[in-house]
Design a protein with these regions (language model features):
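Structural beta-sheet core signal
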Residues: 30, 56-58, 126
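Extended basic (Lys/Arg/His-rich) segments that typically form rRNA-contacting surfaces
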Residues: 54-57, 67
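Short, structured loop/turn "capping" segments at alpha-beta junctions
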Residues: 108-112, 139, 145-151, 218-221
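Helix-rich effector regions associated with P-loop NTPase G domains
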Residues: 1-28, 35-36, 41-43, 48-53, ...
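Glycine-rich phosphate-binding P-loop
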Residues: 123-143, 173
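Short, glycine/charged-enriched secondary-structure capping and boundary segments
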Residues: 43-46, 70-73, 99-100, 140-141, ...
Length: 283
């Protein structure tokens, strides 16, 4: 698969906005898909954020493999990165996020207190790739009491400071992907979970990747969901057999769409597509 290179103008603009507004926030909240704790982190944004304090939120934890979520949280915490694992389809309490923010910024709050300065409100910027669930997370976090804070520095057209409570203000940013995917596996993982448009990658490649990954890591889930599937067969053979078994005749595209939708909707159960072994190839 060739390198996928693309970068819509609005994403380039959003990247600049993130860079310009960093100075107005106390810390950065990075929202990732818990099924892709590593692959759904935008390396371009990570570089821009630099040494700014970070709160890493593993969203959609209800769709991820809980054992893997635990392992990833332990890894990130060992790297000095504070984490939360949440399901933003359920009510996310402001207190949980605010408490995590206060813990993250405890040293700064203490230093300012010694100087006689009381930090009334912490300010953060939420960044993440498309389809990480950022909008749902913010809506749940703010609820119906959401308040737009105007006349503040750092607010570019199309961006708003949102006051969740007296302790926390949030600057929203659009979901931003990076200019090109040089790692084929990362691109396939993003495609399988719906983080990038289906038109960017051939669906047969995405399906074959998904089948092979589930065969290796979650064979019991494949067997449970697709009872006619002979999981010991190679992926292309499985595709041909299942297309016929499901009455699709030779319409392989129909099986690709079905399989990918089943994975995205969690019909195969909880899964995580990143393993700690992936860190070996991470720069």
């Amino acid at each position: 698969m060739a390198t996928i290179q693309w970068f819509p103008g609005h994403m380039s603009k959003a990247r600049r906005q993130v860079q310009e507004n960093l100075k107005f926030v106390d810390f950065v909240t990075i929202l990732v898909d818990a099924r892709l704790p590593l692959s759904s982190q935008n390396p371009m944004l990570t570089k821009i954020v630099g040494d700014k304090p970070k709160l890493l939120i593993l969203n959609k934890a209800d769709l991820a493999d809980p054992a893997m979520t635990k392992e990833w949280r332990q890894y990130f915490e060992s790297q000095g990165i504070q984490t939360l694992a949440i399901n933003s389809k359920e009510q996310v309490t402001v207190k949980v996020v605010t408490d995590a923010a206060k813990k993250l910024m405890a040293d700064k709050i203490a230093r300012q207190k010694e100087r006689g300065i009381k930090i009334e409100t912490l300010r953060t910027m939420i960044i993440g790739i498309p389809n990480a669930g950022k909008s749902t997370f913010m809506n749940r976090l703010a609820g119906k009491k959401i308040a737009v804070v105007g006349n503040k520095p750092g607010v570019t057209k199309g961006q708003q400071w949102l006051k969740t409570n007296k302790d926390l203000e949030i600057l929203d940013t659009p979901g931003i992907l990076w200019p090109k995917f040089e790692d084929e596996t990362v691109a396939l993982k993003l495609a399988l979970t719906g983080a990038i448009k289906d038109q960017l990658l051939p669906m047969d490649e995405v399906t074959i990747f998904g089948l092979n990954y589930f065969k290796e890591h979650y064979p019991e889930k494949l067997a449970e969901r697709f009872k006619q599937m002979k999981i010991e067969e190679e992926a292309p053979v499985i595709i041909m057999d299942m297309t016929r078994a499901l009455g699709f005749r030779d319409d392989y595209d129909r099986f690709y769409s079905l399989f990918v939708k089943e994975v995205r909707d969690g019909k195969l159960g909880n899964y995580t597509l990143d393993t700690l072994e992936d860190l070996d190839g991470d720069d």
